[in-house]
Amino acid sequence: MIRLVLIAILLGALNGAGQDDRVSRLKWMSGCWVRATPRFTMEEQWTVPRAGTMFGIGRTTRRLVSADSVSEHEFTQIHLVNGKLVFSAHPSGQQPADFTESELTDSSVVFSNSQHDFPQNVRYMKGRADSLYAAVDGTVGGSTRRADFRYARTACEK
């Protein structure tokens, strides 16, 4: 009986480890990223994968004459649901939405939700050690739209 319990515990641990490994394939996303222009700064910060999940936060700051102003923010989570990665987005001023993994490689991931208004796809691609590419795309009113974002690695503020 003890042997059966130990085998069950071991199999459960191995199953969980495999799921954690799936999220861990996105470790290259972890860290702090910035995209700056004269008019705005976009920042994303991703935690290191742990316990089958990653958390992210994004902020867009617009440069105004008198001061900077946060115009948008988003809280995100990447986690496992039924063996697939799910990107859960909570953007400011919009309803939360889940996007399910449709493609995963060692250097890119695509999350899709064909029922979402826009975007229907969220993509992250590993660049060089100091860059991260992101894109959102989909169809709006019968027209295809896409927005691409290139981020540079930056030091995480303490």
Cite the ranges covered by each PLM segment.
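N-terminal helix-cap/turn-to-beta initiation motif at the start of protein domains
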Residues: 18-32
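A short glycine-rich beta-turn/N-cap micro-motif
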Residues: 50, 54, 128-133
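Short, low-complexity Ser/Thr-rich regulatory SLiMs
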Residues: 48, 80, 126-128, 153
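Sec-dependent N-terminal signal peptides
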Residues: 4-13
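Central antiparallel beta-sheet cores of small beta-barrel/beta-sandwich binding domains
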Residues: 35-115
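Edge beta-strand at a domain terminus
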Residues: 17-19, 106, 131-158
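Well-ordered alpha/beta subsegment
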Residues: 106-113, 117-126, 133-138
